[in-house]
UniProtKB/Swiss-Prot annotation:
The record marks 205, 263 as: Positions substrate for the nucleophilic attack. Cytidylyltransferase required for protein O-linked mannosylation. Catalyzes the formation of CDP-ribitol nucleotide sugar from D-ribitol 5-phosphate. CDP-ribitol is a substrate of FKTN during the biosynthesis of the phosphorylated O-mannosyl trisaccharide (N-acetylgalactosamine-beta-3-N-acetylglucosamine-beta-4-(phosphate-6-)mannose), a carbohydrate structure present in alpha-dystroglycan (DAG1), which is required for binding laminin G-like domain-containing extracellular proteins with high affinity. This is D-ribitol-5-phosphate cytidylyltransferase. Residues 1-24 are annotated as: Disordered. It comes from Bos taurus. Residues 1-10 have a biased composition (Gly residues). The record marks 59, 66 as: Transition state stabilizer.
Length: 445
């Protein structure tokens, strides 16, 4: 068994832990853990998770196994690990990967600072991979470094959007019933064809459900079931709940899951997952400005217009910027009124870099300059273009997407608001699209 980096808890959703959980994430995690202990009588070290990640991704039609396909330049499996890591009461996460991908997986753990991860070699089938993961937690195995949990969660490496409340429901149900799994209503009607490819009969859709992940089991229930499995089950079986029923005689409690439990299976699913992630990290933007009268006025006008495009906009003079970064804001607009330098933007970049905010998600920084075009010489504009390009090249190495925006600053209020509306459209597009091809560009509104 290969061990990932030692240490405490990992990233909170959606960003990295800087000094443990903070704010709403901390409260939510503490609340869930408290409920977990109260409702299920669970010890703090009683839950582990197993992720089979040895698939080849044949249905996706790409050479890279789907769990390692990049979304916003980060492997898909890293998002799934993050979703489990943010749950403080999951103490160990076992990932089963093929021997040829073992070093790749170690690199992912190190680069994205994942914690509580242990690696085992995957089997040739999904069930054999899960069995190998369970063996890493079993007390009867030689050289076992981990404690046997009371409950084990089995999840798919390519379901990145699992939420803590679903995990809590299946674990609590497993403690009471021995086994539990998430289900969803069927989307399409299931039919049975005859031997000559004609309709034989159809199932009444309302009576059936699709089995999803995560699933949870008392460890002894599922481990004993796998120990009794036939080779046929290990080679061709797909449903863990069925193994618990067949070999341990445990009827699983079925828990209604949320719509975001879907599995990345086809190439189009990668695009859908990317859109969801972009949407989640694009809804909060911080507008950084000076306390000068002109700048405050422009900043608050910009705030007013950005709120029509984005859910949460906060304006700050920079004094509480560190706290905003800790609250995991991934979008910053640095306002510069009647100035052509990048000093304020450079200070902001330094703070973002020092915070490690950009380890998991690309951070968008837009340096906005309000200038009277007639009073700024052309040579100064070109100098600005070259300057932001150099800043952007260095920032991109740390996953920060820096762009510049020139907005006309007329004296008339109506014309200023028109300029701001045009600028807001560009800012919103840069934040939502997160197109790395536009870094270092100086756009004009």
């Amino acid at each position: 068994m290969e061990l990932g980096p030692p240490g405490g808890s990992g990233p909170a959703e959606p960003g990295p832990r800087l000094r443990g959980l903070r704010g709403a994430d901390a409260a939510a995690s503490a609340s869930s853990l408290s409920r977990f202990g109260a409702e299920a009588g669970c010890r703090a070290s009683a839950v582990a998770a197993v992720l089979p990640a040895g698939g080849s991704g044949e249905r996706m039609g790409v050479p890279t196994p789907k769990q390692f396909c990049p979304i916003l330049e980060r492997p898909l499996i890293s998002y799934t690990l993050q979703a489990l890591e943010r749950v403080s009461w999951i103490k160990d996460i076992i990932v089963a990967v093929t021997r040829e991908n073992m070093e790749t997986m170690k690199g992912i753990i190190q680069r994205y600072q994942h914690k509580r991860i242990s690696l085992v070699e995957a089997g040739v089938t999904r069930h054999r991979s899960i069995f190998n993961g369970l063996k890493a937690l079993a007390e009867d195995q030689p050289n076992c470094r981990l404690s046997k949990p009371e409950v084990v969660i089995i999840h798919d490496a390519v379901r990145p959007f699992v939420e803590e409340d679903v995990l809590l429901k299946v674990v609590t149900a497993a403690q009471e019933h021995g086994a539990s799994g998430a289900i969803r209503p069927l989307v399409s009607t299931v039919i049975s064809p005859s031997a000559d490819s004609c309709l034989d009969h159809s199932l009444e859709r309302a009576r059936y459900r699709a089995s999803e992940m995560p699933q949870a089991f008392l460890f002894d229930v599922i481990y004993d079931a796998y120990q009794q499995c036939s080779d046929y089950d290990l080679e061709f079986g797909t449903e863990c709940l069925h193994l618990a029923l067949k070999y341990s005689h445990i009827k699983a409690k079925l828990v209604e899951g949320s719509p975001d439990l879907w599995k990345v299976t086809y190439k189009r699913d990668l695009y859908a997952a990317e859109s969801i992630i972009k949407e989640r990290i694009s809804q909060k933007v911080c507008v950084v400005m000076d306390t000068k009268e002109d700048e405050e006025h422009v900043g608050h006008c910009l705030e007013e217009m950005l709120k029509t495009e984005l859910n949460h906009v906060k304006v700050t003079s920079g004094q509480d910027l560190q706290q905003i970064i800790l609250e995991q804001c991934y979008n910053f607009v640095c306002v510069n009124v009647m100035t052509s330098d990048f000093e304020e933007t450079q200070r902001l970049l330094n703070m973002v870099e020092e915070s490690n905010l950009s380890i998991l998600y690309p951070v968008v920084v837009i340096s906005v300059h309000f200038l009277d075009y007639e009073s700024v010489p052309l040579g100064q504009k070109m100098e600005k273009v070259m300057q932001i390009r150099e800043f952007a090249k260095e920032a991109k190495k740390r996953n920060i997407l820096l762009s510049g925006l020139l907005i006309y600053f007329p004296q008339e209020e109506q014309k200023l608001r028109e300029s701001l509306r045009q600028g807001t459209t560009i800012i919103s597009a840069l934040i939502k699209e997160r197109n790395s091809g536009l870094i270092g560009q100086l756009l004009v509104a």
